[in-house]
Swiss-Prot record:
<dbReference type="InterPro" id="IPR020053">
    <property type="entry name" value="Ribosome-bd_factorA_CS"/>
</dbReference>
<comment type="similarity">
    <text>Belongs to the RbfA family.</text>
</comment>
<keyword id="KW-0963">Cytoplasm</keyword>
<dbReference type="GO" id="GO:0030490">
    <property type="term" value="P:maturation of SSU-rRNA"/>
</dbReference>
<keyword id="KW-0690">Ribosome biogenesis</keyword>
<feature type="compositionally biased region" description="Acidic residues">
    <location>
        <begin position="140"/>
        <end position="167"/>
    </location>
</feature>
<protein>
    <recommendedName>
        <fullName>Ribosome-binding factor A</fullName>
    </recommendedName>
</protein>
<dbReference type="Pfam" id="PF02033">
    <property type="entry name" value="RBFA"/>
</dbReference>
<feature type="compositionally biased region" description="Basic and acidic residues">
    <location>
        <begin position="128"/>
        <end position="139"/>
    </location>
</feature>
<dbReference type="GO" id="GO:0043024">
    <property type="term" value="F:ribosomal small subunit binding"/>
</dbReference>
<dbReference type="GO" id="GO:0005829">
    <property type="term" value="C:cytosol"/>
</dbReference>
<feature type="region of interest" description="Disordered">
    <location>
        <begin position="122"/>
        <end position="167"/>
    </location>
</feature>
<dbReference type="InterPro" id="IPR023799">
    <property type="entry name" value="RbfA_dom_sf"/>
</dbReference>
<dbReference type="InterPro" id="IPR000238">
    <property type="entry name" value="RbfA"/>
</dbReference>
<comment type="function">
    <text>One of several proteins that assist in the late maturation steps of the functional core of the 30S ribosomal subunit. Associates with free 30S ribosomal subunits (but not with 30S subunits that are part of 70S ribosomes or polysomes). Required for efficient processing of 16S rRNA. May interact with the 5'-terminal helix region of 16S rRNA.</text>
</comment>
<comment type="subunit">
    <text>Monomer. Binds 30S ribosomal subunits, but not 50S ribosomal subunits or 70S ribosomes.</text>
</comment>
<dbReference type="InterPro" id="IPR015946">
    <property type="entry name" value="KH_dom-like_a/b"/>
</dbReference>
Length: 167
């Protein structure tokens, strides 16, 4: 079993080889709009999954999937020529869902922005539930002019304390 670092390097190499082979070796016009986005290889280096996106509608995506299945043998042969492993991995092509997920995320962000604007409009026209200034200042009778509390009136016995507050 190969280490994961070797599998990752091999996956990147397979991604490049398949992308180049789609442009050079495969003459099918249905593969012109295919972009290889990622490749993953199992740790035993026997199976490679290649993720791709297709520029176009659902019909173009279905046509591209059929074209990739048809060209799978040519692409595997090209991968076998360009990588240095004992056994050429089998290839599996999977349509990548990143563009769909990205458009869904953009729609969610637009919806959140619209809701934030509604909340901001409601907040601008909102009024306080109680008085306008709920944090009133102290009334004049609550303010004590001296720093002493009323309980600390017996200070006569403190004169005979020394520096360390001992008697």
């Amino acid at each position: 079993m190969a280490d994961p670092a070797r599998a990752a390097k091999l996956a990147q190499r397979i991604k490049v080889v398949v992308a180049e082979a789609l442009g050079r070796r495969v003459k099918d016009p249905r593969v012109e709009s295919i972009t290889v986005t990622d490749a993953r290889v199992t740790n035993d280096l026997q199976h490679a999954t290649i993720y791709y996106t297709v520029f176009g509608d659902d019909v173009a995506q279905a046509d591209a999937a059929r074209a990739l299945e048809k060209a799978k043998g040519v692409l595997r042969q090209e991968v076998g020529r360009n990588i240095t492993v004992r056994l050429t991995p089998t290839l599996e092509f999977v349509a990548d869902q990143i563009p769909v997920n990205a458009s869904n995320l953009e729609e969610l962000l637009r919806e959140a922005k619209r809701r934030d604007a509604e909340v901001a409009a409601l907040a601008a026209s909102a009024k306080h539930a109680g008085e306008a200034d709920p944090y009133k200042g102290d009334s004049p009778e609550d303010i004590d002019e001296d720093d002493f509390d009323e309980e600390d009136t017996d200070l006569s016995g403190d004169n005979d304390l020394d520096e360390d507050a001992n008697r």
